[in-house]
């Protein structure tokens, strides 16, 4: 018969005047066995060969799991009114039940998380009972992260694109311009040209392999109706680490209403993006045309820019002062450097002389057309 060694002592490190159970040996919960923790757990020994239920229960105080070794539970129940705090990774291999209270991880240390292994699952998550901080998943099925912040459950949904790799996520109910634990702000005025607006109410941190896609969720407090006129205009956006700006990550599917719904991103590489949130694309009325450019190959202002035009199927024509077409293209992508490609010009396929030119821009979906002038200067 295996002997279990427990040391019971008073500890003020976690919660004043509460007792803590220190495991310095080897604890194992056998199949159909149950153990209830009404005090803090400090795991400095072996506690990873479990087949039964580990429950954490307290109707008055908070509880914590700490120690030098990671505990691994088969089934875990949390029924702690003032929350269960993790100071060490805690692993689940079958199921977790969020009966009462949050499981709180230190947001300033994303390496500590509640870890769902081997396609494990959870139940009973709510606005007031979820993982407040980081959760991870190791499996090959779709996973709906039970993450939240400030009494607000806001799942992120994804399928692991690389089986047996670890994906991790956390939700932040805060303005990305003023993040609480990140080193740098995420300026919502620093935008890719086709993006017009970014949510300042919330964001997610998501870590996963290349070729990932995510589904973000919202409710009425997300104020999606203040971002876009309709849900088809809504986008998933991400803060690009290298370019230091918000980029469009797409809208492959959207469901629900302004009050509650989901949006799917396109496939992207999470390693390139620090955080994710909701955004809106430039509308036709928000297209911004820069009339002056200097295509002298100095790396600054070398092309004719129509900010946001990449979002629209279009036709662009450029005319000289005699009304001759000197450049024409379908689906302009802000890459014209003043080189002629059409009409009767002296130096076809060469750059046009400095001077004033005129354009017509047609947006094909709406049929809207606009005209104006531009000036080339070398």
Task: Give each language-model segment a name.
Residues 19-62, 67-73, 77, 81, ...:
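Self-processing/autoproteolytic domain segments and adjacent N-terminal interaction modules in large
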Residues 67-70, 207-212, 264-275, 302:
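Extracellular interaction modules
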């Amino acid at each position: 018969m295996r002997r279990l060694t427990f040391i019971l002592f008073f500890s003020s490190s976690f919660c004043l005047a509460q007792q803590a159970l220190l495991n310095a040996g080897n604890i194992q919960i056998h199949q159909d066995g149950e153990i209830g923790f009404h005090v803090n757990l400090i795991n400095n020994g072996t506690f990873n060969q479990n087949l039964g239920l580990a429950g954490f229960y307290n109707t008055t105080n908070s509880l914590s799991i700490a120690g030098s070794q990671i505990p691994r539970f088969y089934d875990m129940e949390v029924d702690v009114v003032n929350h269960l705090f993790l100071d060490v990774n805690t692993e689940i291999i079958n199921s977790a039940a969020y009966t009462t209270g949050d499981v709180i991880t230190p947001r300033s240390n994303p390496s500590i998380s509640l870890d769902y292994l081997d396609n494990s699952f959870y139940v009973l998550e709510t606005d007031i009972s979820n993982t407040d901080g980081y959760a991870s998943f190791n499996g090959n099925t779709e996973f709906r992260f039970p993450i939240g912040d400030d009494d607000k459950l806001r799942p992120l949904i994804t399928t692991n694109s690389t089986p047996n790799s670890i994906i991790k996520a956390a939700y932040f109910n805060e303005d990305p311009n003023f993040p609480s634990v990140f080193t740098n702000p995420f300026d919502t005025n620093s935008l890719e040209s086709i993006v017009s607006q970014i949510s300042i109410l919330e964001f997610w941190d998501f870590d996963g392999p290349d070729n990932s896609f995510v589904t973000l969720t919202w409710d009425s407090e997300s104020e999606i109706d203040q971002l876009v006129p309709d849900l088809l205009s809504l986008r998933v956006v991400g803060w690009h680490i290298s370019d230091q700006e918000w980029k469009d990550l797409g809208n492959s599917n959207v469901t629900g209403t302004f009050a509650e719904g989901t949006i799917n991103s396109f496939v992207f590489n999470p390693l390139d993006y620090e955080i994710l949130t909701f955004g809106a694309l430039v509308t036709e009325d928000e297209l911004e045309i820069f009339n002056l450019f200097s295509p002298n190959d100095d790396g600054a202002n070398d092309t004719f820019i129509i900010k946001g035009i990449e979002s629209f199927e279009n036709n662009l024509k450029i005319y000289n002062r005699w009304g001759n077409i000197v450049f024409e293209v379908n689906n302009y992508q802000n890459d014209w450097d003043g080189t002629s490609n059409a009409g009767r010009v002296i130096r076809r396929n060469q750059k046009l002389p400095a001077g004033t030119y005129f354009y017509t821009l047609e947006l094909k979906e709406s049929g809207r057309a606009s005209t104006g002038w531009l000036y080339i200067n070398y």
